Amino acid sequence: MDEAWERAVEAALQAAGEGSSSPARSLTLDGAVKCLHGRLPAAEILERYQSLEHLSIAGVGVASLAGFPRLRNLTRLTLSDNRIAGGLDHLVAAGLASLRDLDLSNNRIQDVGDLSPLANLRLVSLDLYECPVTRVKDYRSKVFGMIRTLKYLDKMDADENERPESDDDDDDGDGDGDGEEEEDDDDDEDEDPGSGEVANGGVSHPRGGVASHPVEVNGVIDVDEDESDADEVVPNGGDEHHANGFRVAAVGDEDEYVEEEDDDDEEDYEEEDDLGEEIDEDGDDEDAVVEVHDVPSSSDEEEDGIEEEDEEEDEDEEEVEDDGEEAEPESSGRVALAVGDVGEEIDGHEHGEGEDEDENGEIGEEDEERLEDDRVYEEGNDDDEEDVDDEDEDTEYLVQPIAQPQAMAVGNDFDAAEADDADEDRDEVDDDDDGGTDLPSSSQGAKRKRDDDPSGSGDDDEDDDGVEDLRPFKHH
């Protein structure tokens, strides 16, 4: 078993480039040997390298730290991915006074008390990832309280701020980092921007830019698309001459494009003006020119209102004419009634026997009076028609753009016509009353006639009955 560890150590040193001429400072044995019994190799194999500062034995299945080698200069120890559950006091017994960084992640440490031996070491960083102890309540505060020198637990400080990378390189506290930082400095020196060397055959300028010259291929100039806008800008408004003889102007492409658009617009306007002149010339040749003017909406509304008023007046005139036509049948009806009365009287005379001529003459006078009354009524109707015609003429004469005066004028004329009709009706009633008063005179004349002629008493009685029959009919 020890032989396997010796071969693994020699292979690791050769891979790291460590020779016998210079002492080894770092040794990595991760997974090199599988410990069947969970024990470390013999202490003598590793104690040969007292100059070791970094030792890593991870993933080999170590379960016990008994017999750990004494390495006075060891500052970083990695024992992750093993089966360590306790026995950390063996590290203290090994006299690791320089140890600052201990990695025990992914092991089987379950109790915070198992970490108590580490308080005797001056640890600065302790890693316990994936260990069951990390699930204990207030695990971090307890560990920091136990190990006073500890600054970082699981790569975070007490305030849970991550550990800077510079502290990882300077674990021994002497202020000097490892060789990796020195190698980084060498790489930075190799990439000095002031060397003046530029890839792809470009030429560096003092202002830090790189000017790539255009390449002519088959008469076509190919300019790199990666040219920056800063390279195209010419300082102090001057012109830049390239090596191939081309000159770069300070005017941008956008200004030229805008000027071209302005020229095109001016040409379009000139063409439109020419077309307008041609249209004007053609228009002069035509005799009939139609001009369309926009009429305000208010005037249209007024005209519509006047037309509506005219229509209303026409309707009123038609109604007045209809009233005149209806008045004429009334007059004819009265004449018919008068004629009917006369007819009844005639029938009465026909039925009578032996009436005298004087009696017939009196009845004829009554008929003439009735006919005169009818003529007066007809003349009144004629006057009504003339008034209606005058009203029609007045309405036609009073047509004006204003609606209210016309309506008032028409209304007043109709009121006057109605008043005239009422007066004429009163005159007719008076005439009827006069006709009724004349009837007794005829009856008295008839009585005198009967007194003079006693032989015709029977006929006179019949005549009196006919006259009495006429009275109620007339008054009705």
Curated annotation (Swiss-Prot):
Highest taxon of source: Eukaryota
GO molecular function: histone binding
GO cellular component: nucleus
InterPro entries in the record: AN32, Leu-rich_rpt, LRR_dom_sf
Region (Disordered): 157-476
Positions annotated as LRR repeat: 51-72, 73-92, 98-119
Biased amino acid composition, Acidic residues: 165-194, 222-232, 252-289, 299-329, 353-371, 379-396, 415-436, 458-467
Keywords, in A-Z order: Leucine-rich repeat, Repeat
Domain LRRCT: 131-169
Family: Belongs to the ANP32 family.
Protein name, entry field: Acidic leucine-rich nuclear phosphoprotein 32-related protein 1
Annotated source species: Oryza sativa subsp. japonica (Rice)
